[in-house]
Amino acid sequence: MTLVILTILILAYVLIATENVTKVNRAAVAIFAGTVGWVLYICFGMDFVTSEHSEDYTRFLNFSEMESTSTSVKYFISRHIFLPQVGRAAEIVMFLLATMTIVEILNNNGCFDFVRQLLRTRSSKKMLWTLAIVTFLISINLDNFTTTVMMLTMMHSIIPSRRQRMVYGSAILVAANCGGALTVIGNPEGLVLWNSGAVTATVFSFSLLLPCLAAWLIPTLLMQRMLPERVETEWIVMPFRGDDTRLNKWQRLLMLLVGIGGLWFIPTFHNITKLSPFLGALCVLSVLWIVNEIFNRKLMNMDAMVERRTPRVLQYGVVQMILFVMGMILAVGVVKET
């Protein structure tokens, strides 16, 4: 049965890697692999428990004064094997949920509008490198998926040419993935390694610094040659914030510092308290939430906070990403227990 479960996991990885070909959502595949794997595990639980957890199972029987039956095995698996795996998965999911909510609060209050001001140029090279550098730096602090969606949405509203959009979009994707890979909070994979204690935040970043810079700079230099001297742009007037937020520049800057600075503080929080990183992320979220309530107090009292500017693709994509991470952690967990 171990071979069957392992085969399911391998097939799931293949389907995830070929998502563009199969058109099957990777989150659905991950959730299916995780749930089916655990169902098979508990159906043949006696073999796995006696081979991998015999001492723990014996102590469980002695403590609970139960006989070794299929029911007691299932109870042992659900309480002492399955729940710890769910706990590990929940830690990652809660961290992602907290950080993505932080991004939503910042985005709704216009804290990233400064990026549009930096992009006011007709030079294609300057536009390319500004997009790439800003995306790289933001993805270091936020997760790469959220950064990609946010920057692509912004770029799409500025550049009308389809061909130029493809080049700038590719640069954004490369920068977001390389920036996200540089820190433990930049992508789910690094977060899983850090949360499991396999790496430390400092060693992780220093080890990947040169590879990430090379993987980012070399493709961007090559893409630079594909652009004309001048870039075609169209600037849409910034939307009136009467129904969204009335924060001034300094209030937005303060919220940005609280959000981004708080995310940077999470590794320190983990090292000092030894508590799970998601608790630090929730702490940052709560502080930012309070600041948001204070700054928008008058607007909330007027019941005017009805329009949100977060792209729908981001909202739907966040749910998919969380389900995908949850499914993959459960799938890997069941293989680990076999």
Task: List where the protein language model places each region.
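Interfacial loop-to-helix junctions that mark the boundaries of transmembrane helices
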Residues: M1, V21-R26, H53-N62, Y75-I92, ...
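Structural signature of hydrophobic alpha-helical transmembrane segments
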Residues: M1-I8, G87-A98, I140-T148, C178, ...
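Membrane-interfacial loop-to-helix junctions in multi-pass transporters
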Residues: M1-V4, A89-I92, L119-I133, I159-Y168, ...
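Intrinsically disordered, low-complexity non-transmembrane regions of multi-pass membrane transporters
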Residues: V4-I8, V14, F44-S78, M226-V258, ...
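Juxtamembrane and boundary regions of transmembrane helices in multi-pass small-molecule transporters
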Residues: V4-L6, S161-M166, S170, L182-T183, ...
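Short helix-coil transition sites and intra-membrane helix breaks within transmembrane domains
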Residues: T22-K23, V103-D113, I138-M150, G179-N187, ...
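Transmembrane helical segments that form the transport core of multi-pass membrane transport proteins
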Residues: Y57-E67, G87, N109, D113-L118, ...
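Hydrophobic transmembrane alpha-helices that form the pore/transport pathway of multi-pass ion
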Residues: K126-A181, V192-N195
